[in-house]
Amino acid sequence: MELRTASSPRDVKTYDTARLREEFLIQDLFRPDEVKMVYSHIDRIITGAAMPVNKALTLAAGEELRAEYFLQRREMGIINIGGEGKVTVDGTVYTLRHRDGIYVGRGCKDVVMESVDSAKPAKFYFNSTPAHKAYPTVYIRPEDCVNVELGSLEQSNHRNICKYIPVSYTHLTLPTN
């Protein structure tokens, strides 16, 4: 797991493009048959990716988290941006098609990711944050997401935000698959 320390807001103002990229850009997230994670001391967030091609990949805590298992004190959201894949959470299998997501709550011990077809591997992008309460695992389809349109064309900042895991989702019971 790569570690990133916080930067002083005052110092960041003096960074040139190369330094900004060095401090904040995450590259090469999707590596065949690997889980890559970057831990940022800013908000203690972990950004990561898993691209299982020829084998299933298990999410491990690593010594950086000082935990018995990855979600012992954390929660996470996973979105599949590749081919069809499966995420197994404590023995329950969830099939994630392209753009499907899953919220996995604190306390889940085993998270395993695999591709259905190695010629079209799943690409699981995820974020994980500290959690203080356990919520159930929730399977999320793109049509379940909350879409928010922001900005304007006139201001050159028009965009659509697709919220896979708004706060209310952790309290809902959505389809399990």
Tell me what each language-model feature is.
Residues M1-T5:
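Basic/polar N-terminal segments that are highly enriched at the extreme N-terminus
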Residues G91-R106:
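Short acidic-glycine-tyrosine-enriched beta hairpin
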Residues T170-T176:
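Conserved small/polar residues in nucleotide/adenosyl-binding loops
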